[in-house]
């Protein structure tokens, strides 16, 4: 029995009989499946696997969620993921951390394209440094995975799959948010550029984000609950296809952040 399947198409099976000395050619015309696409994940066992066949449960966060929730960073998008808790800690710096299975953020491994680039410390402060415009999808696995992804993957794993160039395109956006009409603003500027050669052998995806958030004092005690934040991120994802089955990839990520608690106003008298 010969079985053929592809992402976005219905599977087909056909019984064939092989005879010695003869070449058999079978042609398949797959029907597109518009009802449900069988997603492919890589975090479960470090190889591309159909989501329903993965040995562990993998939750996927798509760019559509970031758009619908107006999320500009990874930390804002993970808030809407079931089984994952994103909390803001430290009154001084206001960093964000991901809690999976009740454990601190340092026990969750942050991956970029299945590689443990972030240390346990950077995984705590880096959630707000990863812009949504570089993310193709986010795969979240709850439970230990130290044998596959490193010693920090005790509570779970968050794998960020970055976007690859598909066609020539570009986008620019600027968003301004205000906190309860207090005069504190969150400005976010994002830029994307995708370039692909005519023969599809070479391509490059460039992204950038600049964010400036004013300090915000919610209760008027003179000390900001949300610290002042300046964030700049720029990156590149390029490839060169050497053959139909192999390619050379180049990635560059630069992230810079400054945050500080400010004394917004004089303290109120007791």
Model-predicted regions and their roles:
Residues 75-119, 136:
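Extracytoplasmic beta-strand/coil segments of soluble accessory domains associated
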Residues 78, 138-139, 158-160:
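Non-catalytic regulatory/gating segments with a bias toward low-complexity or hydrophobic composition
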Residues 97, 137, 157, 190-192, ...:
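Membrane-embedded beta-strand positions in outer-membrane beta-barrel channels/transporters
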Residues 56-74, 97-103, 113, 178-180:
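Short, polar/charged loop or turn motifs at beta-strand boundaries
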Residues 3-10, 19-67, 105:
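Short, acidic, small-residue-rich periplasmic hinge/interaction motif at the N-terminus
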Residues 152-154, 185-189, 228-232:
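Residues that define the transmembrane beta-barrel architecture of outer-membrane proteins
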Residues 97-99, 115-142, 163:
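Short acidic/polar hinge/loop motifs at secondary-structure boundaries
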Residues 167-177, 181, 192-269:
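Periplasmic-side early beta-strands and strand-to-turn transitions of outer-membrane beta-barrels
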């Amino acid at each position: 029995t010969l079985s053929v399947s592809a992402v976005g198409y219905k599977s087909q099976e056909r019984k064939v009989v092989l005879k010695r000395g003869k070449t058999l050619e079978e042609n398949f015309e797959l029907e597109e499946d518009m009802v449900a696409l069988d997603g492919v994940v890589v975090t479960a066992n470090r190889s591309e696997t159909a989501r329903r066949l993965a040995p562990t449960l993998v939750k996927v966060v798509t760019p559509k969620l970031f758009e619908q929730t107006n999320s500009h960073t990874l930390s804002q998008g993970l808030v809407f993921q079931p089984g994952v808790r994103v909390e803001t800690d430290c009154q001084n710096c206001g960093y964000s951390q991901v809690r999976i299975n009740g454990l601190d953020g340092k026990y969750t491994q942050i991956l970029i394209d299945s590689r443990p680039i972030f240390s346990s410390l950077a995984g705590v402060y880096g959630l707000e440094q990863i812009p949504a415009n570089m993310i193709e999808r986010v795969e979240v696995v709850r439970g230990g995975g130290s044998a596959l992804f490193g010693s920090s993957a005790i509570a779970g794993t968050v794998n960020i799959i970055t976007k690859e160039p598909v066609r020539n395109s570009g986008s620019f956006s600027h968003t301004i948010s205000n906190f309860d009409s207090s005069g504190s603003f969150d400005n976010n500027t994002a830029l994307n550029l995708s370039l692909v050669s005519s023969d599809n052998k070479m391509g490059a995806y460039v992204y950038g984000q600049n964010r400036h958030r004013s300090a915000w004092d919610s209760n008027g005690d003179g000390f900001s609950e949300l610290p002042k934040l300046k964030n700049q991120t720029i990156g590149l994802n390029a490839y060169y296809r050497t053959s139909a089955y192999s390619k050379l990839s180049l990635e560059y990520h630069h992230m810079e952040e400054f945050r500080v608690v400010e004394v917004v106003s004089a303290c109120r008298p007791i």
